[in-house]
């Protein structure tokens, strides 16, 4: 909201307060002033000039040689390139020595051999935004009214000796989306009175009701509609003071009639619309819901297709305007308009908001209806508009209005005690001081033994509960005046929970392993909701009652589908190597009508290269063992590695030979594996591996304690063993048998090679293990190690039918 400092002074006496002081005070009262703009931008030396003579430049077709009276002893010659310069006009002239925006100084000059003692200015050259300049002057110089005084300060006439405050309003303060609302706020801050606009309306004997009737079919969407006739208007420019105020408010002047409706909008916050009465096509206004597919061409020359929940203003058959959003081109006020029908209405904010969003069309009017307007100003606004049209457009305001009034404005009384105000704010404000504040706010009230019963005016729909009144007192008292106190009472040092600590360990380890954290949607589509679940669940996923789209209609049962979407998105954009993880919740359905069970899971996905080609080694492609290694490292960090085993598994969407369940103490807590080739094809990815597991179950396991020991004084001995076994043999089971057979001396077993090449018999594979033997108390002999190693060989031969590879 842009607020002209000089315009504001018409409603509240603040001449003793500078614009910057006012901005600081408003900000401290709870409404942020985002900036204060000085309109003149350092311009000086610009006066009103009267063009006495104007002829073509002898050496240039597009230049004019003008003799201009600027209020000094002698007129001056100025060369001007504007197409609309002409004899007899009064124009803004920057004299020699004048300063324009950007510290541009005007000097004597010669243009094509002719002397020029100044510059005739366009509004843009005086610092006014070109978007706010009326079309009449957009491509030329500005022309003052004929009664402008020659030599007078042009900036004063243009109202540029002004400052504009930009208010950053929150949605609940729609009452300040107009000058009167801001005036009430400022008056409350300074304890001053609000001067309401004087309405000098002279009506004719003819009645508005003789020309138009109004009926409302959609009473819920439009509880109040008022219309008034103004005849015999003469379309032209609005008065200079009105144009400059509108430009200061960020609105481009158009014509006197249209400018008056916009002026009332900015003054009262009441949107108005002016119809060309002679183009209505009937003598009735009917407000109804649109017919599905009904069309209307709006003022922006766009044809709009309406839906059945959109509210329209019609002539009984044809739509004339989209209620609260924008008028129609068919009944637009033009230069030929003679008779005007003014509309002032109260439209339901929800209806306007939905219509505006559907049509992709926002306006100053729709913004105010959406947030809520003061319905008690609707009649006053239309009367003031009619008075201004009679005065500045030469119109004749007909007697009375025609209205359809189904609006019931209920009085709101909100109560609060002085004790509560002081308790919440931490202040010691007396009841009489609070009463003064409510008086300054223009809130009528009664006080009974320290309890205030406040009648809230309709202009403040944000005041509904006692806490709102506490806030009002706090704002006017000044948040900067509230005493500063330190928290009292026993202080306890905060700390992370066990789960929070472990989650941080998970993130730190996975990011160290080269995975990036992703945060995906908790909502998914129906067909993806049950994909890649850790545990099968026959119940239907939890669905939203009113989803925004089918793609986001179900609560997820797995993190994997959303991560795969992210991988597919990246691969499609030539980012072929992706490693992502997510810590997030899944939502397990429970009994019907009950909330789902929320369980935290960890999922990851890797595709492409695990190690890019570098000078120190060859590139490494992601495979099952790369991802399994990441998980084993994670389990080791969490202290549960000895409790985790892996079992071959077949899962929907996963590769049947490269998928395993993750088992913790006999319970399946997750899975790891490669996507099924068909799934990879659908996602347009290759060689993609995923895992998902329940963090709740991992964190709930008893973590192994960490022990520290001295550096060994005695050497260890390593023996390698490569055995040939059937392809069905599980390396993990063999590793466990080796560890048991090796006894106390065998400290570590590592699988370092798997071979299934051409030299192996069909159905066979080679597994190679490295075994480390060690005794912390002495040096082992070769015989002791050989004895333990032979036990290992015997165990794997008996258990798995293994043969030493030769």
Curated annotation (Swiss-Prot):
Its main location: cytoplasm. Its EC number is 6.1.1.20. One of its GO terms (biological process) is phenylalanyl-tRNA aminoacylation. SUPFAM superfamilies: Anticodon-binding domain of PheRS, Class II aaRS and biotin synthetases, Nucleic acid-binding proteins, PheT/TilS domain, Putative DNA-binding domain. Binds 2 magnesium ions per tetramer. Belongs to the phenylalanyl-tRNA synthetase beta subunit family. Type 1 subfamily. This is Phenylalanine--tRNA ligase beta subunit. The gene is pheT.
């Amino acid at each position: 909201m842009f607020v002209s400092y000089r315009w504001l002074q018409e409603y509240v006496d603040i001449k003793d307060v500078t614009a910057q002081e006012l901005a600081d005070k408003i900000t401290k009262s709870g409404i942020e002033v985002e900036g204060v703009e000085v309109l003149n931008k350092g311009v000086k030396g610009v006066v009103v000039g009267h063009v006495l003579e104007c002829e073509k430049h002898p050496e240039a077709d597009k230049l004019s040689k003008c003799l201009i009276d600027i209020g000094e002893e002698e007129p001056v010659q100025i060369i001007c390139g504007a197409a609309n310069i002409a004899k007899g006009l009064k124009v803004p002239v920057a004299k020699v020595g004048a300063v324009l925006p950007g510290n541009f100084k005007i000097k004597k000059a010669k243009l094509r051999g002719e002397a020029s003692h100044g510059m005739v200015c366009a509004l843009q050259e005086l610092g006014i935004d070109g978007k706010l300049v009326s079309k009449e002057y957009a491509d030329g110089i500005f022309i003052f009214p004929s009664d402008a005084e020659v030599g007078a300060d042009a900036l004063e006439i243009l109202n540029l000796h002004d400052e504009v405050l930009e208010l950053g309003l929150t949605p609940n303060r729609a009452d300040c989306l107009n000058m009167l609302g801001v005036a009430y706020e400022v008056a409350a801050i300074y304890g001053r009175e609000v001067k309401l606009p004087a309405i000098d309306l002279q009506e004719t004997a003819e009645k508005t009701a003789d020309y138009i009737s109004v009926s409302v079919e959609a009473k819920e969407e439009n509880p109040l509609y008022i219309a008034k006739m103004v005849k015999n208007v003469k379309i032209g420019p609005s008065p200079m003071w009105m144009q400059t105020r509108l430009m200061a408010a960020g609105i481009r002047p158009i014509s006197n009639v249209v400018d008056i409706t916009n002026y009332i909008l900015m003054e009262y916050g009441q949107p108005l619309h002016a119809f060309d009465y002679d183009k209505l096509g009937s003598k009735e206004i009917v407000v109804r819901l649109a017919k599905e597919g009904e069309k209307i061409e709006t003022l922006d020359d766009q044809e709009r297709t309406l839906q059945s929940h959109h509210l329209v203003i019609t002539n009984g058959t044809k739509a004339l305007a989209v209620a609260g959003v924008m008028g129609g081109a068919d009944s637009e006020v033009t230069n030929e308009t003679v008779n005007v029908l003014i509309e002032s209405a109260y439209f339901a904010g929800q209806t306007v908001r939905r219509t505006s969003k559907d049509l992709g069309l926002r306006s100053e009017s729709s913004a105010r209806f959406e947030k809520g307007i003061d319905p008690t100003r609707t009649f006053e606004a239309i009367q003031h508009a009619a008075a201004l049209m009679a005065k500045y457009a030469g119109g004749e305001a007909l007697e009375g209005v025609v209205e359809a009034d189904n609006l019931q404005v209920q009085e709101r009384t909100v109560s609060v005690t002085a004790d509560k105000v002081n308790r919440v704010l931490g202040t010691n404000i007396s009841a009489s001081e609070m009463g003064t504040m409510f008086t300054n706010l223009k809130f009528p009230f009664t006080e009974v033994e320290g309890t205030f019963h406040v009648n809230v005016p309709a202009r403040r729909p944000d005041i509904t509960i006692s806490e709102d009144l506490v806030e009002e007192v706090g704002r006017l008292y000044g948040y900067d005046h509230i005493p500063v106190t330190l928290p009292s009472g026993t202080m306890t040092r905060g700390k992370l929970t066990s789960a929070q600590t472990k989650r941080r360990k998970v993130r730190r380890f996975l990011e160290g392993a080269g995975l990036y954290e992703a945060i995906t949607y908790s909502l998914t589509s129906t067909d993806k909701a049950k994909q890649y679940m850790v545990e099968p669940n026959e119940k239907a996923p939890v669905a939203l009652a009113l989803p925004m789209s089918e793609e986001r209609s179900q609560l997820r049962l797995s993190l994997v589908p959303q991560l795969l979407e992210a991988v597919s998105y990246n691969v499609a954009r030539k980012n072929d190597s992706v490693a992502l993880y997510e810590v997030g919740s899944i939502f397990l359905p429970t009994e019907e009508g009950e909330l789902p069970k929320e369980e935290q899971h960890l999922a990851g996905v890797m595709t492409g290269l695990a190690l890019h080609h570098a000078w120190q080694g060859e590139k490494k492609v992601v495979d099952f063992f790369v991802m399994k290694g990441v998980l084993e490292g994670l389990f080791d960090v969490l202290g549960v590695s000895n409790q985790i085993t892996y079992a071959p598994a077949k899962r929907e969407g996963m590769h049947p030979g490269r998928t395993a369940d993750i088992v913790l103490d006999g319970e399946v807590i997750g899975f790891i594996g490669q996507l099924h080739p068909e799934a990879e094809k659908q996602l347009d990815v290759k060689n993609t591996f995923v895992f998902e597991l329940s963090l709740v179950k991992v964190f709930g396991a008893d973590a192994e304690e960490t022990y520290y020991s001295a550096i060994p004084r005695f050497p260890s001995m390593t023996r390698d063993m490569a055995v040939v076994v059937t392809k069905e043999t599980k390396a993990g089971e063999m590793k466990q048998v080796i560890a048991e057979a090796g006894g106390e001396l065998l400290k570590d077993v590592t699988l370092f090679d798997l071979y299934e090449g051409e030299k192996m018999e069909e159905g066979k594979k080679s597994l190679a293990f490295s075994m480390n033997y060690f005794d912390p108390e002495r040096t082992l002999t070769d015989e002791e190690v050989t004895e333990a190693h032979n036990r290992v060989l015997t165990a794997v031969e008996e258990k798995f039918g293994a043969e030493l590879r030769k």
